[in-house]
Amino acid sequence: WSSLVFASVGAVLALWVNKCDDRNLFVGAERPNSGTSKFRELLSGLAIMKREPKVLVGGIVRVINTTSQFAFVVFMPLYLKDYGIGDTQWASIWGSIFLFNILFNLIFGIVGDHIGWGRTIVWFGGVGCAVSVLLFFYAPVICNNFWFILACGALWCIMLAGYVPLSALVPSLVDKDKGAAVSVLNLGAGLAAFVGPLIVALFRNAIGYVGIVWFMAGLYILSAVMTYCIAPRNR
């Protein structure tokens, strides 16, 4: 029921509080004013991935960003039970570590403006997540302590926030249809919720949880390379 309250508040903010054109960066010449133009806008969100390959790459990076989040929630409770971490402790870890993610979403936005969006995504997002996703998984092996596992999980959540500048970087890659570029990122965010559990389902028997985690670490390194390729050197 609380989620319904949050969704309602978000709808009010989007539809009434923030409806003024001069406060919306994506409203202007591209604003749809009829049913036909709205349909064209929808098609442009799909066509831009073909017309602007860098936007497609940015969308793939967005998928990789939170893939581990949706994979971990599937198998980490089962994995940690082997080390004596029960469901209650796991729920406490999972709920607590994302408080750090919320805080660092803001911090990495500021960091990105100072050192560059691309650099922030590459080093904190890509490389940082590759290291921290492994550290979180191997935490009970290194030191089977609740607080140590929580700290490693918090570091992973902090590094997830390193992808925050992607929301600014991808629209900046196109001269027009910036709204369509943002929609590609939204699509990537949604796909991550599907891709994460899919990876676990496909590879659990073949390579086990260890193989899955190393595979995800490889995906993060790949996302760092992809971001480096699409990001302008001054961003």
Identify the residue ranges that each predicted region occupies:
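Helix-to-loop junctions at the C-terminal end of transmembrane segments
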Residues: 105-117, 204
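Extracytoplasmic gate region of multi-pass secondary transporters
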Residues: 53-105
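Helix-loop junctions on the cytosolic side of multi-pass membrane transporters
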Residues: 14-30, 229-235
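C-terminal transmembrane helical hairpin of 12-TM major facilitator-type secondary transporters
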Residues: 118-166
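Symmetry-related core transmembrane helices of the 12-TM Major Facilitator Superfamily/SLC fold
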Residues: 1-16, 213-228
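Juxtamembrane intracellular "pre-TM" segments in multi-pass secondary transporters
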Residues: 21-59
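A late C-terminal transmembrane helix in Major Facilitator Superfamily
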Residues: 174-209, 216
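Juxtamembrane helix-start elements in MFS-like secondary transporters
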Residues: 86-94, 145, 178, 182
